[in-house]
């Protein structure tokens, strides 16, 4: 059955059974017991509001990857337009460092807000875990802003 979690003025989040959320300084962690990965959500107030949400989502994602010196092919970014938001997502696997890591990073952007969601795990544990995390992000919905 799962549960619905509301972050006031931001989003409704639908967590499947076994998932829990905990707030940290400036972000939220979504975790499931005995899972090899976690989802991190970061909430961002948009400063520049003239760029359409789908284009802004791609810009946020590219800027974040560049700031962290993550080498990525721009054509690997997938875009999605939702009725209430633009979405940009990329998968990145680091297999060169000692601790191999797989990130799936999303930016969901509406007219005034942006959310960065990142699923982080060992690439050996890819599979249904990352699929379930992706479904959580796909079901995330912005609460309509009173500023629109």
Task: Go through the PLM ranges and name each one.
Residues 51, 98, 126-127:
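Loop/helix-junction capping segments adjacent to catalytic residues or to phosphate/diphosphate-binding pockets
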Residues 61-111:
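Signature of long, low-cysteine stretches enriched in small and polar/charged residues
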Residues 37-40, 86, 112-118:
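Glycine-rich, often proline-containing surface loops adjacent to acidic residues and nearby aromatics
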Residues 19, 116-148:
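Surface-exposed amphipathic alpha-helical segments
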Residues 24-28, 84, 112-113:
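Beta-strand-connecting loop/turn residues
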């Amino acid at each position: 059955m799962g549960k619905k979690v509301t972050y006031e003025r931001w989003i409704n989040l639908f967590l499947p059974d076994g998932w829990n959320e905990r707030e940290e300084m400036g972000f939220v962690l979504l975790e499931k017991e005995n899972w090899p990965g976690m989802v991190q959500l970061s909430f961002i107030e948009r400063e520049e509001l003239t760029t359409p949400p789908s284009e802004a989502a791609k810009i946020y994602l590219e800027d974040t990857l560049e700031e962290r010196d993550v080498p990525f092919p721009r054509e690997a970014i997938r875009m999605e337009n939702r009725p209430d938001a633009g979405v940009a997502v990329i998968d990145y696997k680091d297999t060169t460092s000692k601790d191999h890591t797989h990130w799936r990073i999303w930016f969901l952007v509406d007219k005034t807000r942006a959310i960065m969601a990142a699923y982080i795990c060992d690439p050996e544990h890819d599979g249904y875990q990352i699929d379930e995390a992706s479904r959580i992000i796909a079901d995330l919905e912005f609460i309509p802003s009173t500023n629109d």
